[in-house]
């Protein structure tokens, strides 16, 4: 990241084809007066995510979208890190859901592996979500941040809100999963706080350097 930060304004591309992630990003950006258009709306392709870290993959997506659209691009790479599974699925969280984005199957796979390892008690079911955010400009300038939220995994999944692995993730200090929370509760944005979810926490960091509230 450059030592000289750059502010976002005007029109930006949200470099995702994931409807749930797109909705969350638009909600987070709403107070800042930027016009957000999705990669899908611009018919942009999806680059190969060949990075070995969340941050590397976020940068790949943002840089590719900024170059293709010739607009600033905002990308997220995120996933769940299960401690008893040696960090899996990690950067492969989306791939575990397969081409049909079947996160019910992905959650079932995690639970099966946890059971095989004898991880039945809460003390053995620790996990954290990671969100890496990157903003890239067509001239190559980037700004990037990363954040996490810790919790435990429950079974069976609870709630139908959110997306992805939300219904099985119980954030630390709470008695409801992300799947049981409203988007406002999950994000934990003012007046409720400064970020509960991994994406909200990363966004707060990014907003401090790249965005001016209306």
Curated annotation (Swiss-Prot):
Transmembrane segments: none annotated. SUPFAM superfamilies: ITPase-like. Its EC number is 3.6.1.66. Mg(2+) binds at residues 48, 77. Substrate binds at residues 16-21, 78, 163-166, 186, 198-199. It holds the Pfam family Ham1p_like. It catalyses: XTP + H2O = XMP + diphosphate + H(+); dITP + H2O = dIMP + diphosphate + H(+); ITP + H2O = IMP + diphosphate + H(+). InterPro entries: dITP/XTP_pyrophosphatase, ITPase-like_fam, RdgB/HAM1. Disulfide bonds: none annotated. Its cofactor is Mg(2+). Keywords: Hydrolase, Magnesium, Metal-binding, Nucleotide metabolism, Nucleotide-binding. CDD domains: HAM1. One of its GO terms (biological process) is purine nucleoside triphosphate catabolic process. One of its GO terms (cellular component) is cytosol. GO terms for molecular function: dITP diphosphatase activity; ITP diphosphatase activity; metal ion binding; nucleotide binding; ribonucleoside triphosphate phosphatase activity; XTP diphosphatase activity. Binds 1 Mg(2+) ion per subunit. HAMAP family: Non_canon_purine_NTPase (MF_01405). NCBIfam families: RdgB/HAM1 family non-canonical purine NTP pyrophosphatase. Pyrophosphatase that catalyzes the hydrolysis of nucleoside triphosphates to their monophosphate derivatives, with a high preference for the non-canonical purine nucleotides XTP (xanthosine triphosphate), dITP (deoxyinosine triphosphate) and ITP. Seems to function as a house-cleaning enzyme that removes non-canonical purine nucleotides from the nucleotide pool, thus preventing their incorporation into DNA/RNA and avoiding chromosomal lesions. Belongs to the HAM1 NTPase family. This is dITP/XTP pyrophosphatase.
